[in-house]
């Protein structure tokens, strides 16, 4: 469905060739944008540190203190329910981890880092507790659901809304890396959630290595957004999250994944998918989309992770900067998908 760049003659650019003035202008613009981002990043972190509206840590959370309102669905490796604690509604995710008490305690310790999470782009965390052979994570309830569900209900995301979603996703990743020192590891539309205030936040990130190991994820669901280096068995890095971001943007913009197979549930379909990710040229947005957006996605989807953009470099790109400046009523858009 996407035009793919072909280079059958193996042409390469001359590294000693002179740079055109237009290229110099573009490079200067990127440098200026990068400086602008760097000068504002401290203010952004300061804003996060002084957030007033965020879930407070609740020390007495346990299974008996929660009233189950309704089942919300299945998350990565666990069931998610809307629950009520006193007058607070929250989303509880229950993950089976087994009967090893040392493992359970280690997971709860690792989750403790979320006490310090103060970002408008990361879903709030009330606390976690062990019950039988499960760990329950109690999080901020986002009443408009995930981008995955919104995409199914509403179709491709409007371009002005998409820009704001990308702004929020990249800022969320930067907060995870710079403040919590966490790599997301499973970035995709189903792990980006929205509320009726128009806030867009990341969830289900890999804060606990042991919990990640305990979660039984299907290989297909994960591999769809997986970077080529991860499929080859390479190390997971920040750049792997950026690849997943690029694939997610294509899906949100077109309501289609770059590689689709009718028999994706069988082993042949999975192998075809993995072959495409590793061997085929990177997917691109169709030419009908704005050039700045297409260049932004291209920067996310270099096969070589050393050439792939970092989160900071993405922030310096013209598309990201332009999306920041556009005023969009996200709350009105999000209210169309509010859960009853």
UniProtKB/Swiss-Prot annotation:
ATP binds at residues 72-80, 93. The active site is at 186 (proton acceptor). Residues 66-320 form the Protein kinase domain. PROSITE patterns: PROTEIN_KINASE_ATP (PS00107), PROTEIN_KINASE_DOM (PS50011), PROTEIN_KINASE_ST (PS00108). GO terms for cellular component: cell division site; cell tip; cytosol; nucleus. Pfam families: Pkinase. InterPro entries: Byr1-like_cat, Kinase-like_dom_sf, MAP_kinase_kinase, Prot_kinase_dom, Protein_kinase_ATP_BS, Ser/Thr_kinase_AS. Its EC number is 2.7.12.2. GO terms for molecular function: ATP binding; MAP kinase kinase activity; protein serine kinase activity; protein serine/threonine kinase activity; protein tyrosine kinase activity. Keywords: ATP-binding, Conjugation, Cytoplasm, Kinase, Nucleotide-binding, Phosphoprotein, Serine/threonine-protein kinase, Sporulation, Transferase. GO terms for biological process: conjugation with cellular fusion; MAPK cascade; pheromone response MAPK cascade; regulation of ascospore formation; sporulation resulting in formation of a cellular spore. The modification Phosphoserine is found at residue 214. The keyword ATP-binding applies. Residues 1-24 are annotated as: Disordered. It catalyses: L-seryl-[protein] + ATP = O-phospho-L-seryl-[protein] + ADP + H(+); L-threonyl-[protein] + ATP = O-phospho-L-threonyl-[protein] + ADP + H(+); L-tyrosyl-[protein] + ATP = O-phospho-L-tyrosyl-[protein] + ADP + H(+). Serine/threonine protein kinase involved in conjugation and sporulation. It is thought that it is phosphorylated by the byr2 protein kinase and that it can phosphorylate the spk1 kinase. When bound to bob1, is involved in the regulation of sexual differentiation. Interacts with bob1 and spk1. PANTHER family: DUAL SPECIFICITY MITOGEN-ACTIVATED PROTEIN KINASE KINASE DSOR1-LIKE PROTEIN, SERINE_THREONINE-PROTEIN KINASE STE7 HOMOLOG. This is Protein kinase byr1. It comes from Schizosaccharomyces pombe (strain 972 / ATCC 24843) (Fission yeast).
């Amino acid at each position: 469905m996407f035009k793919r760049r072909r280079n059958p003659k193996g042409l390469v650019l001359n590294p000693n060739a002179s740079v055109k003035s237009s290229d110099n202008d573009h490079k200067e613009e990127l440098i200026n944008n990068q400086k602008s981002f760097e000068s504002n990043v401290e203010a952004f972190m300061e804003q996060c540190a002084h957030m007033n509206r965020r879930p407070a840590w609740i020390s007495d959370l346990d299974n008996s203190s929660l009233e189950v309102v309704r089942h919300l669905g299945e998350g990565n490796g666990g069931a998610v329910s809307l629950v009520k604690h006193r007058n607070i509604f929250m989303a509880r995710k229950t993950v089976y981890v087994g009967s090893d008490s040392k493992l359970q305690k280690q997971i709860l310790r690792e989750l403790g880092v979320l006490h310090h999470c103060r970002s408008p782009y990361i879903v709030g965390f009330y606390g976690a507790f062990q019950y039988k052979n499960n760990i329950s994570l109690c999080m901020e309830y986002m009443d408009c659901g995930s981008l995955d569900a919104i995409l199914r209900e509403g179709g491709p995301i409007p371009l002005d809304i998409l820009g704001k979603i990308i702004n929020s996703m990249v800022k969320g990743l930067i907060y995870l890396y710079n403040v919590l020192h966490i790599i997301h590891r499973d970035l995709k539309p189903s792990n980006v959630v929205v509320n009726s205030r128009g806030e867009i936040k990341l969830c289900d990130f890999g804060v606990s290595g042991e919990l990640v190991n305990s979660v039984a994820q299907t290989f297909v669901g994960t591999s769809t957004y997986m970077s080529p280096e991860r499929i080859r068995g390479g190390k997971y890095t920040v750049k792997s999250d950026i690849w997943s971001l690029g694939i997610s943007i294509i899906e949100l913009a077109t309501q289609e994944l770059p590689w689709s197979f009718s028999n994706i549930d069988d082993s042949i379909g999975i192998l075809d998918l993995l072959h495409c990710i590793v061997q085929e040229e990177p997917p691109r947005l169709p030419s009908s989309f704005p050039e700045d957006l297409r260049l932004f996605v291209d920067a996310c989807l270099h096969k070589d992770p050393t050439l792939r953009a970092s989160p900071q470099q993405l922030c310096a790109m013209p598309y990201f900067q332009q999306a920041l400046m556009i005023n969009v009523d996200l709350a009105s858009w999000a209210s169309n998908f509010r859960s009853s």
